[in-house]
Amino acid sequence: MEDGFGMYSHSMSCPSTASTSFSSASSSAYDPFTPSSRRSTPNELSLDLDGSCSYAAHQHSLELTPPTTSMAKYFMGQTIKQEPEQMSFGSLPTTPMKKVDGGFAAEYDLIDMNMASHHSMGTITPSNSFGLHTISPETAMGPTSYMMTPTQSLSGSEIAESSSSWSVTNESPINFFQQPKDLSFHDMDSLDLDERHHHHHNHHQHHHAQQSPMGQHFQLHSNTGASPNSMRVQRKMMLHEAQRKTSELQRAQIRESRKRAGKPESGAVDVVRRAMCKCDYPGCNKAFRRNEHLKRHKQTFHGEGPNRFSCEFCGKDQFNRQDNLNNHRKLHARPNSRNRGVEFIPEAVPIIEHEERSRKRRAPPKSKAEKRDYDF
């Protein structure tokens, strides 16, 4: 089981038959996998400058449950008792581990192992044990494939009580938007799960999908294979549909308010004041809202008041003001007058034009441009 090889004329004895036991608790599903060991050098390391380097590698076993007994190994005539080293982990990895510096660097992808808190999962053992290899500066030892074998059977109720809310891979929003490209190890051949572990994992996943509404949402999209781009397009379509319905509702409300405003209410108050000022001349039924309008009516039609003015073109004498007479006379000089009650008289045109030319007019107001010129 031991081979000798030389590397830079040094001797290194590395008994690597070690059994490591640790327990896990699913407190956080996304913290980096950083084990805290109580020992810095759990195995014995000896150097010999004259001999050859021997590397004893039997089977590397990584146990998640403590072994029942400690076993002793014999190496080069010395008895080395390997005690199981207890290591406590805050959480199991759900994110890829960092690469290990050295000849054999293994990159681990996402493996969701949050099945139960404070329960042992199983034993991860190499599926094909590797023997001794001759190590030289040009060569490196490659990783081997592993296999998970559960050591304790868990019931469905225990899994449901002790599981984490984001233990299911498909329920996690990080895993939903960032699906791992490869669920196997970087250079490993296979990842073989036991039939019992697969049954418990499916039961746990189904239980969480029924309990969590968000889990149902992510589970639905993860099962249908929806990509982030398709989900983004779907969200934009839903937003556009909501905006369209909102605008339609606003337009309907505006139309309804206009219809209500157009219909007169039965109990509306009449704000228009009634014509209370009535003419008292016999046979005249005129009524006015304001008293001054009634006074003007009496002066015009009934001859009340002094300063009566008459038109020389038509003979009307119902004008008690000079400006009213002048406006009436101008209407006789306009052939296309809008007032059909005033007749067009051609003889009035030159007279009105002469009065317009001889009338003293006020100086037109200066424009702003002219004022600026004077200021400068």
UniProtKB/Swiss-Prot annotation:
Disruption phenotype: Abolishes conidiation.
Chief location of this protein within or outside the cell: nucleus
Residues spanning the signal sequence: none
Bias kind Low complexity: ranges: 20-29
One of the protein's GO biological processes: conidium formation
Keywords: Activator, Conidiation, DNA-binding, Metal-binding, Nucleus, Repeat, Sporulation, Transcription, Transcription regulation, Zinc, Zinc-finger
Biased composition (Polar residues): 34-44, 219-229
GO CC terms, sorted: nucleus
Biased composition (Basic and acidic residues): 241-256, 367-376
Zinc finger (C2H2-type): 277-301, 309-332
Induction trigger: Expression is positively regulated by stuA through direct binding of stuA to the abaA promoter region.
GO terms of molecular function: DNA-binding transcription factor activity, RNA polymerase II-specific; RNA polymerase II cis-regulatory region sequence-specific DNA binding; zinc ion binding
Region (Disordered): 20-47, 197-229, 241-267, 351-376
Composition-biased stretches (Basic residues): 197-209
Task performed by this protein: BrlA, abaA and wetA are pivotal regulators of conidiophore development and conidium maturation. They act individually and together to regulate their own expression and that of numerous other sporulation-specific genes. Binds promoters of target genes at brlA response elements (BREs) containing the conserved sequence 5'-(C/A)(A/G)AGGG(G/A)-3'.
PANTHER family documented for this protein: C2H2-TYPE DOMAIN-CONTAINING PROTEIN, KRUEPPEL-LIKE TRANSCRIPTION FACTOR
Protein name: C2H2 type master regulator of conidiophore development brlA
Source lineage: Eukaryota, Fungi, Dikarya, Ascomycota, Pezizomycotina
